[in-house]
Amino acid sequence: MPALRAGARITIVAPASAIAGAADEAAEWLLERGYEPQVMPAARARLAPPFDYLAGDDAARLADLHAAFADPAVGAVWCLQGGFGSWRVLDQIDYGLLRRHAKPFIGYSDVTALHLAIQRYAGFVTFHGPMLAQDLLAGRQAPTEQALLDMVSGRLGAGSWIAAPPQARLATLASGVATGRLIGGNLALLAALTGTRYAIDARDGILFFEDVNEALPRVDRMLAQLRRAGAFDGVRGVLVGSFTRLLGVPGDGEAAQAALYPLVREHFQARGIPVLAGWPSGHGDPNLTLPLGARVTLDAGRGALRLEQPVAV
């Protein structure tokens, strides 16, 4: 994977939803940091009801994605925000084109659908990291931006440890060390893609999941759905990310998130694998970047990840 260089062109895409005016603000944000921003048309668009949750029609969003990858002058493809609709274009993506022009692709939440599809059919590492409108324009904590730059710029190589900031309240639900390919993303999207050719396969991998605005019974149901579909068969370790604004649980933050942990234990304890929870990646603040598709080691007792391969060079 080519690393993102200083002053590189970064293309802003909106494969799902968009917010009016956010694309131009994001371009200014990139410009202030010395990059050359390029805004694709759908990132400035929004369909009329009932499809007003989409940033442009499927053909336009797909064309933006293809053009961003095909352009050799583009150093990274960065999603403006999540929302809804990334899954609508999965069948039409030219995965061969993406494979031939692999470059850092950054996003999370609804973009999980693209992460899974790209890893399965294009075969390169993608970055579960902050989005421009959803995170960086919203003023996330400093580790959010720095962790992304460290990951995509090639500063981290094989053997580098990825640690959560000191204020993170990690919880070792099951101790141990495991090595495998990091795979996962937003839990609702992982469950929604069950039974399709884009479904997650965590065999011999380290499973990561996170979510926002979910109730514990729904989290329980989604985990049960994935487990019964065989998605967890052969998984070597589990990394539980941010679960922000758990519905029906008083408060927010790490203390509220701990209400989730007995449920997670129930779903994975029989497997005898390491489980680390409270990792600050996803819809929380900070939102640390993870290299999906990369080989990593999870040390649940130490509360850290180690890269077993370079992810950007």
Features from the language model and the residues they span:
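N-terminal glycine-rich "phosphate-gripper" loop used for MgATP/nucleotide binding
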Residues: 76-87, 92, 108
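Conserved beta-alpha junction segments in alpha/beta enzyme cores
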Residues: 18-29, 177, 181-212
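Internal helical hairpin/lid segments
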Residues: 198-260
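ATP/NTP phosphate-donor binding region
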Residues: 1-73
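Short, acidic/small-residue loops that bind anionic groups at enzyme active sites
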Residues: 93-117, 125-132
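A short helix->loop->beta-strand "cap" motif at the edges of active sites that frequently abuts
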Residues: 8, 73, 99-104, 122-124, ...
